[in-house]
Amino acid sequence: MKERDQSLLSRRRFVGGLGTAMLCAPSLLRAETLAPVRRNASSFRTHSWQDHFDTLGKGIIIADTISRALQQWTTDGTMFVYPTSVPMTDELTRRGYTEIIFKDPEPDWTPTPSMRERDPTLPAYMPPGPDNPLGVRSLHLTWQYYRIHGTHDTRKIGRRSSSGCIGLYNEHIIEVFERTPVGTQVKLI
């Protein structure tokens, strides 16, 4: 009798497990047929600064437009990684070596001529403030019109959404701004 109870018990477990599997199968099959969804998140592929620069100097920033992440190294080698917004198209993207030439603690915004050409409804000028597209801080690069800056529109982070600049959450640009001296080496890849 004891042997029979054990076999009944194992048959019950088998039947119960089969029932559970049948209940789960439709949702598993449905998940396989859905198209993949592109998420608003960065892959945070990281780089080694030594692959791009000879020395840390005053610090290093590498902005990766593929992984949509900014890496910052301070002079002591401490690394920080942040999600970014990147240019909407490759035509708007400038890549290569540059550096920080000016730190703007309250950026105002003047759309570039090409931005105004693409969208004539843009204002000619916007003073510093909560609606300013450059956010609360801006780091100017040697390339005209190119910046690393904050953004008031947090939906842009992790996406191709800028007209050429690298955008960060406002709280992140404040951190980067505080650690970044003029002369910091920058590479956009």
Identify what each model region corresponds to:
Residues 11-12, 69, 167:
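Short, cationic motifs built from Arg/Lys/His that form the positively charged side of catalytic pockets
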Residues 1-9, 20-23:
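N-terminal secretory signal peptides
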Residues 33-113, 128-130:
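Cell wall/extracellular polymer interaction/catalysis modules
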Residues 29-31:
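Boundary at the C-terminal end of the N-terminal hydrophobic targeting segment
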Residues 16-18:
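Sec-dependent N-terminal signal peptides
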Residues 56, 88-96, 108-189:
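Exported/periplasmic cell-wall-interacting domains
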